């Protein structure tokens, strides 16, 4: 059976095409939509950056750090760059799953962006 992304999965994908301050190229992303939505072929995914990009993004107040989360993937989840992507077309593959508190924190940041 083919992989179906689920909320809390860290996946590998390529964010091109993109423009402006959006993340470009191959990166990891955090899936925030659930399986029912994802079965339609789309998934809501926030890109994850590492290194200097992650440090700079922390000044936005819209990122969630993976440092100390117990994941192999480190860096910052960019909640301000949430994207709806056709995960089949982007050949998304599973890397690992984050603890629930990371998902909760990311969803809270997105809620603040949209409703505050």
Label for each model-derived stretch:
Residues 1-116:
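Conserved functional hotspots at enzyme active or ligand-binding sites that engage polyanionic ligands
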């Amino acid at each position: 059976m083919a992989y179906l992304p689920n909320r809390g999965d860290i996946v590998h994908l390529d964010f091109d095409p993109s423009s402006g301050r959006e993340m470009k190229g191959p990166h990891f992303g955090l899936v925030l939509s659930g399986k029912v939505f994802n079965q339609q072929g789309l998934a809501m995914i926030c890109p994850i950056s590492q290194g200097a990009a992650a440090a700079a993004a922390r000044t936005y107040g819209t990122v969630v750090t993976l440092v100390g989360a117990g994941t192999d993937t480190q860096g910052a989840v960019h909640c301000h760059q949430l994207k709806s992507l056709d995960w089949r077309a982007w050949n998304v593959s599973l890397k690992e799953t984050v603890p629930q508190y990371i998902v909760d924190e990311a969803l809270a940041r997105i809620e603040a962006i949209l409703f505050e």
